């Protein structure tokens, strides 16, 4: 079991029946961790496996994908993410939960997997955790850029 520094973060790509999970132990590089499959819209079933991951990796920050429409409108999927954020904050009070614009992250993930010659089944299996990796990496890059400007 890997132990990590105090700036360990998770990236989450929440779908109707999948949760893609990415991890950064250093605050610099995100890597895909896993995809959790669950019954459609049964988001409460994600709490126990997330609790294990949060404890195992000593997670301090969760970056949850926020699926805005391309015109910046907030739809039902964004509302679901917002509600899930509240659930995470209530269950894991010690963890900071951030909503992060995830537009096109799944499209990027699928393109990346196709570029790496992954088969269709593998693409469907991995797209959510790769999307979570993109979400988390975008957040980490943003933090690094804005932290460097302050110093």
UniProtKB/Swiss-Prot annotation:
<dbReference type="GO" id="GO:0004518">
    <property type="term" value="F:nuclease activity"/>
</dbReference>
<dbReference type="InterPro" id="IPR037027">
    <property type="entry name" value="YqgF/RNaseH-like_dom_sf"/>
</dbReference>
<keyword id="KW-0963">Cytoplasm</keyword>
<dbReference type="InterPro" id="IPR012337">
    <property type="entry name" value="RNaseH-like_sf"/>
</dbReference>
<dbReference type="Pfam" id="PF03652">
    <property type="entry name" value="RuvX"/>
</dbReference>
<keyword id="KW-0540">Nuclease</keyword>
<dbReference type="InterPro" id="IPR005227">
    <property type="entry name" value="YqgF"/>
</dbReference>
<keyword id="KW-0690">Ribosome biogenesis</keyword>
<keyword id="KW-0378">Hydrolase</keyword>
<comment type="function">
    <text>Could be a nuclease involved in processing of the 5'-end of pre-16S rRNA.</text>
</comment>
<comment type="similarity">
    <text>Belongs to the YqgF nuclease family.</text>
</comment>
<dbReference type="InterPro" id="IPR006641">
    <property type="entry name" value="YqgF/RNaseH-like_dom"/>
</dbReference>
<protein>
    <recommendedName>
        <fullName>Putative pre-16S rRNA nuclease</fullName>
        <ecNumber>3.1.-.-</ecNumber>
    </recommendedName>
</protein>
<dbReference type="GO" id="GO:0005829">
    <property type="term" value="C:cytosol"/>
</dbReference>
<dbReference type="GO" id="GO:0000967">
    <property type="term" value="P:rRNA 5'-end processing"/>
</dbReference>
């Amino acid at each position: 079991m890997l132990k990590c520094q105090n700036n360990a973060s998770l990236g989450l790509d929440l779908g109707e029946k999948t949760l893609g999970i990415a991890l950064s132990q250093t605050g610099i590089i995100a890597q895909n961790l896993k995809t959790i499959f669950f019954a459609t819209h049964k988001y409460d079933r994600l709490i126990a496996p997330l609790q294990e991951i949060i404890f195992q990796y000593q997670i301090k920050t969760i970056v949850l994908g926020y699926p805005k429409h391309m015109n910046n409108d907030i739809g039902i999927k964004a509302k679901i993410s917002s509600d899930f954020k509240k659930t995470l904050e209530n269950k894991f009070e010690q963890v900071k939960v951030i909503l992060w614009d995830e537009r096109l992250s799944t499209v990027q993930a699928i393109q990346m997997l196709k570029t790496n010659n992954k088969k269709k089944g593998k693409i469907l299996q991995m797209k959510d955790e790769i999307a979570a990796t993109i979400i988390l990496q975008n957040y980490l890059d943003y933090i690094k850029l804005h932290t460097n400007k302050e110093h």
